Amino acid sequence: MAELNFSLRLPRNGALPFTIADRTRRVYDTVSSVYPASTFFFHSKAHDLALRHSGIRDGMRVLEIATGSGEMFRRLVQVNPSGTTFGLDLSPNMAARTQFHARRKFPAAAAHCGAVDARQMPFPDASFHAAMCCYLFELLCEEDIRRTLREVHRVLRPGATFSLVLIGQNVEFFNRAYAVAGSLVPAFWGRQVEQSVPEMVAEAGLRVERNQFVRQGFYPSRVLVFRKPAR
Ligand SMILES: C[S@@+](CC[C@H](N)C(=O)[O-])C[C@H]1O[C@@H](n2cnc3c(N)ncnc32)[C@H](O)[C@@H]1O
């Protein structure tokens, strides 16, 4: 059996000096069949809010970055039945699960999900009317966050929206618990980046239009919607 050692301690200040993509891929591959429970209990309220304010409607070309087990992806396909919805996730098991359930629930829809690294997306410039990304940036180092944001900017059409969900840093006891979890299994938890990423998105050339905190039980999220300026 393959060795599964996901622990690689983070420095005490919580910095992620480099992205540990191989470990992240393995850990998310391993948990893919149970991950829907986590989405249901901790992410579904923020997913609702992000979708509601995303401006996504039927007939668009929509991209979801880091689909996880596909709960948001199915919502996107549902609101975009005659458009095209693409998804990607680093973990092949997550991507396969997302594709399988979307096809089963919406057999007639153009919905495609593959195992792709968000840091280098295989889409031409200006391909999408909208992109959605929930709880990914916690897992990338700063350089890779910036690189991924450049990719997001590149694949969006002028006037397109970018909806982003981050783990909130506005609940002190949660922050402490997250720092412990992140230092034990960084490939799964990463570290919180909610206070720094919005500025990086702005630096990548997108303008913020909506910014809201939401809490599901003890789990805080921040939902932001950005827009790529029209030419
Ligand atoms: C915390 S989960 C979030 C899943 C889902 N977006 C949600 O809202 O529940 C993070 C996901 O990001 C994926 N991921 C991590 N690094 C990635 C990368 N470089 N490119 C694409 N996906 C990545 C993981 O495989 C995992 O499925």
Per-segment meaning from a language model:
Residues A130-E143:
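A short SAM/SAH-binding and catalytic strip from SAM-dependent methyltransferases
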Residues L63-Q120:
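Class I SAM-dependent methyltransferase SAM/SAH-binding core
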Residues R119-A131:
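A short acidic, Gly/Pro-enriched loop at the edge of an enzyme's catalytic core
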Residues R146-P158:
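A short glycine-rich, Lys/Arg-flanked "PGG" loop and its adjoining helix->strand segment in the class I
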Residues G159-L166:
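Conserved beta-strand signature within the Rossmann-like core of class I S-adenosyl-L-methionine
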